[in-house]
Amino acid sequence: MNILMLSPEHPDEPKSGLGVHLNRLISYLNPHINITVFTPSGQLFSYAKFEDYIADANFTMVRHVLSHNKRFDLIHAHDDTTAPAAQYLKQRLGLPLAATIHGLESERKKVCREAPHPYRLMTERLLIESADALIVLSTFMKRSLDKAAHKKITVIPSPASMEEEKGKIPRSMNRRFLFSYGRFVPEKGLSQLLKVFAILKQRQPDLYLVLAGEGPSLSCYEKLAAAYNLKDRVMFLPFLNRKDIRTLLSHCEMAVFPSSYEPFGLAAQESMEQGVLTVVSQSGGFCDYAVHDKTAIIADFTLVQEAADLLDSFLKDREKARRIKEAGRQQVFKLHHPRLIMSSYLQLYERIFNNSAIH
């Protein structure tokens, strides 16, 4: 089977969880099916308007696909920003369309108390309505979609990485630290984490906080760290490759992901897979695999004092931490093993292809 895959970022150069997810998924599926990935060639910052970037990106993807001169059996689109190309190519090539909804911009903006971009609302609806089958990574995401779409939704989580290679920790990192990583955007909840850490450090005086990633909120977080007198206790690192992330995970006291909106939680999955004591927020895709006091720690980061108390108690209880770390690792292998994920995708692709009236 030949799959035409559309994505806003290339799996070989991931810049977010979507790219990391694709990188892993394609590596597991490639021995069994042929996947050709098409991505935009332009850069968002070079466009005056977001709509112009999306329009040009989709036009470019369509042009590249049509000039590729290869027969495909199915289109798999990732993210609503590929919706115009996906919908057009479905009609032009007469192919069934599967779409993975990695998150909803409408829900993300609601959490941040901002108005979603009208163009994104349109592309979300276009992709959901055009797809013959929808894939989401968590039951949380399934609940987020309209009930009318539920009949064509399949929940398939992101596969575990199964990678163990680590590097050597820099001498400057030879200290006790909490670790969090991802995009520096409001919905990741890092402003709340800084507030919690400001309290926690008073009880854990040798503890540091390491934040790795990139995004528009970086300067805001740096100012917050200074306001809470944390400049010498918080270290900001750039976007890291997976090997460096595993290295830091292997040396941290715990990994903390306080997101206010999280469709799946790939970083938390990665942390648990590495056997790290993992703290997540109460909502989102975390809930499919993070069970409080069993496989992970679930905290309400809006209650700053209570969250600090909770983290402090687990940092001091080594035996309980050891039990949770091992259970978390086993949970990820049980629910997200690549064999399970690969089988689910192959079966879904086959079903979509066989059910299509146009193949």
From Swiss-Prot:
One GO MF term: glycosyltransferase activity
Enzyme class: transferase
A biological-process GO annotation: biosynthetic process
Matching CDD domains: GT4_PimA-like
Family: Belongs to the glycosyltransferase group 1 family. Glycosyltransferase 4 subfamily.
InterPro entries per record: Glyco_trans_1, Glyco_trans_4-like_N
The protein's name: Uncharacterized glycosyltransferase YqgM
Signal peptide extent: none
Lineage: superkingdom: Bacteria
